[in-house]
């Protein structure tokens, strides 16, 4: 990039096949002077008849494929990063460009720095490229773990933006009580959920709609919190879940339910060309490898910041809104690439 003399630059990895019209379509985004970076959808190469299960899984669930929905890119949103496999950018907005000390997650870091600088970053799935995915089992698992190691570096540079969980304290208490499966679980959950409903209802703009608004927001936040708990137990925090499962029958039961429920829901959303059992096994292996990478990065960096949740404060927010999980559109929390 230091040698680029043009107004725009496009980074393209050597294992990418650019489809016709993609670069022209990306260039169109920069007619908006606020746009600094734009990226296309990254799909796999067409599958051969001999393609194995991992190839079919990656075709449906690659970490590089951010889905069919266009959108603004920013931390803790539906599209929280863009892979640097293909990026078009306005040179003046990039500053020093990629941090060359980072060998993983450098693309996430660049996008987040650009967004923090006040620029707009866009995901443009209307155009696409093809990527030569890793489809050998060990190479695939190693790459997933490698992605996970970047969480520690991002946490050092961007703090809570990389947090794997964003939790409302009251709803987290309610869901946590139910997960504990004790005699006091239901009363505690009811009290915590009722307190959240009261807070949301008190801030509804219309007195006539307070109860309905509060109930709707509380229900949405409880569901989102439950999915975050399931994702944490099977992805970022699975080592802790595994330890709990060794000593507690309730924990084992809860982890099995979480692993099955999250996997089945993901299968229904992705609709892969795989049978449910094979997809579920590969999905769990994907999460285990990524989580192992996150913990390896944390141990290497001697910091658990990338594993800590962020606690929201609903009583201090300007508007009542449900707690949302940033991935698993692709992943729970931020999927580091």
Whereabouts are the PLM-identified features?
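Actinobacteria-biased recognition of intrinsically disordered, low-complexity terminal regions
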Residues: 307-337
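Glycine-rich, basic loop-to-helix element that forms the pyrophosphate-binding segment
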Residues: 1-4, 70-74, 113
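Active-site-adjacent helix/loop segment of glycosyltransferases
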Residues: 124-125, 130-188, 199-296, 302, ...
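Short aromatic/hydrophobic "clamp" motif used to bind/position activated sugar donors
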Residues: 9
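A short, conserved alpha-helix in the catalytic core of glycosyltransferases
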Residues: 83-87, 93-97, 101-127
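The conserved acidic donor/metal-binding loop of glycosyltransferases
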Residues: 13-17
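Short, flexible, basic/aromatic active-site loop/helix in glycosyltransferases
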Residues: 40, 56-79
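Conserved donor NDP-sugar-binding/catalytic core segment of glycosyltransferases
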Residues: 21-54, 132
């Amino acid at each position: 990039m230091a040698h680029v003399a043009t107004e725009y630059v496009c980074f393209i990895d050597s294992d990418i096949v650019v489809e016709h019209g993609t670069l022209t379509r990306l260039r169109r985004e920069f007619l908006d002077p606020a746009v600094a970076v734009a990226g296309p959808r990254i799909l796999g190469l067409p599958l051969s008849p001999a393609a194995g299960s991992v190839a079919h899984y990656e075709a449906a669930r690659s970490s590089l494929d951010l889905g069919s929905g266009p959108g603004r890119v920013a931390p803790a949103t539906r599209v929280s990063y863009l892979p640097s496999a293909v990026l078009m950018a306005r040179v003046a907005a990039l500053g020093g460009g990629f941090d060359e000390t980072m060998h993983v997650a450098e693309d996430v870091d660049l996008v987040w720095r650009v967004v923090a600088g006040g620029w707009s970053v866009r995901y443009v799935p209307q155009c696409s490229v093809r990527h030569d995915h890793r489809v050998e089992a060990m190479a695939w698992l190693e790459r997933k773990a490698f992605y996970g190691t970047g969480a520690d570096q991002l946490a050092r540079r961007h703090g809570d933006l990389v947090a794997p969980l964003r939790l409302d304290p009251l709803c987290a208490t309610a869901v946590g009580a139910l997960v504990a499966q004790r005699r006091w679980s239901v009363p505690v959950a009811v009290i915590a959920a009722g307190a959240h409903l009261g807070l949301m209802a008190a801030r509804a703009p219309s007195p006539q709609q307070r109860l309905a608004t509060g109930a709707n927001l509380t229900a949405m936040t409880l569901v989102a919190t439950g999915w975050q708990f399931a994702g944490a137990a099977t992805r970022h925090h699975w080592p802790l879940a595994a330890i709990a499962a060794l000593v507690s029958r309730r924990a084992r039961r809860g982890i099995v339910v979480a692993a099955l429920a999250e996997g089945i829901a993901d299968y229904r959303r992705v609709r892969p060309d795989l049978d449910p059992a094979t997809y579920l096994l590969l999905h769990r292996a994907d999460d285990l490898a990524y989580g192992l990478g996150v913990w390896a990065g944390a141990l290497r960096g001697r910091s658990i910041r990338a594993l800590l949740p962020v606690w929201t404060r609903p009583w201090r927010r300007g508007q009542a809104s449900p707690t949302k999980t940033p991935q698993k559109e692709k992943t729970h929390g931020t999927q580091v690439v």
